[in-house]
């Protein structure tokens, strides 16, 4: 199968040019002017549009069981939504398994979840929910099987203490894996939460007040120091929500420490005032939404290169689940927001179209750097001969208002309802196959492939 994309502006992280792009058998074969491929081929006219590498979202939670509820997106509805939003690769954070389970247990469970449902290519992050000799011995074998990143939690039920974190950091570093971490100070959160509950203060706004930015920033600083103690182990901070944590990361980077950081559209575009609305429970996530000042600090990091990746942390619970389980108490509400379908459009509209970032920086944040950090480059995140034919075409002339009824996930609401975006996703191709076109999903469940990722190699800081 041959596909020729003509008349568009092809953009990679290192530059852009108005040129044609030829995909053959799912692989980019040629870029240039006036390409004349052998017949037969499909021709796509991208006049006036940007032709970007397909998005790489390295932070999703599909089919996750958090104990009190299971998220309402599985690997079909979740990857369908991703495809319709221009994302062609996801790396899903595996959920916790039974007490004492091995790493392989969760890998086998999640490969079963995705195998016949995923629309786009996928991989997983391992999750380390406890430390013992068996887990430490298992890590190199899992890396050899293509999982080269693992997540640690400093909060929630399976949080690790500092000694366990050090053991994990050392072993992951030795094994060629990147450590990712959810950084919040669990003890401080528990203390604040208990105070509010004892006082009968359980409305959504107290979720944010119980998890102040200092809880997140302290944990970031602690992880930076522990990574240094563990032999300068590489570290990736997920879902950054505040400027103080970013300051600590800037300092570490200035000291040539191998640390990277992601943020998410919700921390760039939503703020804590959402908790005081009638539907405040729909915005419960951790870390919580912050104020506009923190948004501005994050946008500075987006613009100046201090932030490396924009992912989603897509974790969908319906309003029915939230209301039934929480019964008006923020501490009982399942955490997470939908967003995998909106990431590319939101960042393009609020970043590129406002002049905050260039189209090249957009590629860096949404596909190139995620692919580099997580062992997928140059197969993903790049439009060049030999790379996968993963493409998203965005028309900057079109304006769209986000409405839940037009989205493709399995949620019953969107936190982005009513947002007007300048720029529309008009087509998504995965390995040369159109899976979304002009508002219509055309992919199929099970066509996505499991990606064996290479061991971690740090990009140049």
Swiss-Prot record:
Record lineage: Bacteria, Pseudomonadati, Pseudomonadota, Gammaproteobacteria, Enterobacterales
This enzyme's EC code(s): 3.5.2.-
GO biological process: pyrimidine nucleobase catabolic process
UniProt note: pH dependence: Optimum pH is 8-8.5.
Source organism: Escherichia coli (strain K12)
GO cellular component term of the entry, any: cytosol
Protein encoded by which gene: hyuA
UniProt protein name: D-phenylhydantoinase
Highest taxon in the source lineage: Bacteria
Disulphides: none
Gene3D superfamilies on file: Metal-dependent hydrolases, Urease, subunit C, domain 1
Residues annotated for a divalent metal cation 1 binding in this entry: 59, 61, 151, 313
Short name of any one Pfam family annotated for the protein: Amidohydro_1
Reported cofactor(s): Zn(2+); Ni(2+); Co(2+); Mn(2+)
The record's account of how the chain is modified after translation: Carboxylation allows a single lysine to coordinate two divalent metal cations.
InterPro entries (alphabetical): Amidohydro-rel, D_phenylhydantoinase, Hydantoinase/dihydroPyrase, Metal-dep_hydrolase_composite, Metal_Hydrolase, Metallo-dep_Hydrolases_sf
Family stated for the protein in its record: Belongs to the metallo-dependent hydrolases superfamily. Hydantoinase/dihydropyrimidinase family.
Function according to Swiss-Prot or TrEMBL: Catalyzes the stereospecific hydrolysis of the cyclic amide bond of D-hydantoin derivatives with an aromatic side chains at the 5'-position. Has no activity on dihydropyrimidines. The physiological function is unknown.
């Amino acid at each position: 199968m041959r596909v020729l994309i003509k008349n568009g502006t092809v953009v990679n992280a290192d530059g852009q040019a108005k040129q044609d792009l030829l995909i053959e058998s799912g692989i980019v074969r040629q870029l240039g002017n006036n390409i004349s491929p052998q017949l037969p081929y499909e021709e796509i006219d991208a006049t006036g549009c940007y032709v970007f590498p397909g998005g790489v979202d390295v932070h999703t939670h599909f089919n996750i069981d958090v104990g009190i509820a299971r998220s309402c997106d599985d690997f079909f509805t979740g990857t369908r939504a991703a495809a319709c939003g221009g994302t062609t690769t996801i790396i899903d954070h595996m959920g916790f398994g039974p007490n004492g389970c091995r790493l392989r247990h969760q890998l086998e469970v999640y490969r079963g979840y995705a195998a016949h449902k995923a629309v786009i290519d996928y991989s997983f992050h391992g999750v380390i929910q406890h430390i013992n000799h068996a887990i430490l011995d298992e890590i190199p074998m899992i890396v050899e099987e293509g999982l080269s990143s693992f997540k640690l939690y400093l909060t929630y039920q399976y949080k690790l203490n500092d000694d366990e974190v050090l053991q994990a950091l050392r072993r992951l570093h030795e094994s060629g894996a990147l450590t990712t971490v959810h950084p919040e100070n669990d003890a401080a959160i528990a203390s604040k939460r208990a105070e509010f509950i004892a006082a009968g203060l359980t409305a959504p706004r107290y979720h944010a007040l119980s998890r102040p930015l200092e809880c997140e920033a302290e944990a970031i600083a602690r992880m930076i120091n522990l990574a240094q103690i563990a032999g300068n182990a590489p570290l990736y901070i997920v879902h950054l929500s505040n400027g103080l944590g970013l300051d600590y990361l800037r300092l570490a980077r200035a000291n040539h420490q191998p640390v990277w950081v992601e943020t998410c559209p919700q921390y760039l575009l939503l703020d804590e005032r959402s908790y005081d609305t009638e539907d405040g429970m729909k915005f419960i996530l951790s870390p919580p939404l912050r104020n506009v000042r923190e948004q501005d600090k994050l946008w500075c990091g987006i613009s100046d290169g201090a932030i490396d990746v924009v992912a989603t942390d897509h974790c969908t619970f319906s309003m029915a689940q939230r209301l039934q389980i929480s019964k008006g108490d923020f501490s009982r509400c399942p955490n997470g927001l939908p967003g995998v379908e909106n990431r590319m459009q939101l960042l393009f509209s609020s970043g590129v179209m406002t002049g905050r970032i260039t189209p090249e920086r957009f590629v860096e944040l949404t596909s190139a750097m995620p692919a580099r950090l997580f062992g997928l480059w140059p197969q993903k995140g790049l439009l060049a001969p030999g790379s996968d034919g993963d493409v998203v075409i965005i028309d900057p002339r079109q304006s769209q208002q986000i409405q839940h009824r037009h989205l493709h996930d399995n949620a019953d609401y969107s936190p982005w309802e009513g947002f007007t975006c300048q720029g529309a996703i008009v087509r998504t191709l995965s390995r040369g196959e159109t899976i979304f076109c002009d508002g219509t999903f055309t992919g199929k469940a099970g066509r996505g492939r499991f990606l064996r990722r290479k061991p971690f190699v740090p990009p140049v800081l």
